[in-house]
């Protein structure tokens, strides 16, 4: 459960990211593919080379979904319901991949905002991404 302090940290961090969310989403996705090659299996139709426009575009979709989640932290199941359905029933993404991408998002944010990435912010973002992952995989059961 996200505490009020966690929510404040997440919102403040997302505000600082601003217009870079899409860029960071693409970078995190690239990092995920490089670090965990098995995640590429869900994107056989993509050009997965570094700097690929398709990876950047999908990274922006990830970032947009997270921006929506930040705006609706008090009701994530409703905010992410359609996305959960898509990943569970149509795309059938292995739930572990959300954890892998979450880790790469944390690394990407830490690289770009080291001064703001305090232990408290790190913990809050980790809890937030974990909560989002749990919601996205809730319909797998």
Curated annotation (Swiss-Prot):
The modification N6-acetyllysine is found at residue 16. Involved in oxygen transport from the lung to the various peripheral tissues. Red blood cells. Belongs to the globin family. Coiled coil: none annotated. Transmembrane segments: none annotated. The modification Phosphothreonine is found at residues 8, 108, 134, 137. The modification Phosphotyrosine is found at residue 24. It comes from the Eukaryota. One of its GO terms (molecular function) is haptoglobin binding. O2 binds at residue 58. The keyword Transport applies. InterPro entries: Globin, Globin-like_sf, Globin/Proto, Hemoglobin_a-typ, Hemoglobin_oxygen_transport, Hemoglobin_pi. The keyword Phosphoprotein applies. One of its GO terms (cellular component) is haptoglobin-hemoglobin complex. This is Hemoglobin subunit alpha. The modification N6-succinyllysine is found at residues 7, 11, 16, 40. Heterotetramer of two alpha chains and two beta chains. The lineage of its organism: Eukaryota, Metazoa, Chordata, Craniata, Vertebrata. The modification Phosphoserine is found at residues 3, 35, 49, 102, 124, 138. Residues 1-141 form the Globin domain. Pfam families: Globin. Heme b binds at residue 87.
């Amino acid at each position: 459960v996200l505490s009020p302090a966690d929510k404040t940290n997440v919102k403040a961090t997302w505000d600082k990211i601003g217009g870079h969310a899409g860029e960071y989403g693409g970078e995190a996705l690239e990092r995920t593919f490089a670090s965990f090659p098995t995640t590429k299996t869900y994107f056989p139709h993509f050009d997965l080379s570094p700097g690929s426009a398709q990876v950047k575009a999908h990274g922006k979709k990830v970032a947009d979904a997270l921006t929506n989640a930040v705006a609706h932290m008090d009701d994530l199941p409703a905010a992410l319901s359609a996305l959960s359905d898509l990943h569970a029933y149509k795309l059938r993404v292995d739930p572990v991949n959300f954890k892998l991408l979450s880790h790469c998002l944390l690394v990407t944010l830490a690289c770009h905002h080291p001064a703001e990435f305090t232990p408290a912010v790190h913990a809050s973002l980790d809890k937030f991404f974990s909560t989002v992952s749990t919601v996205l995989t809730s319909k797998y059961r």
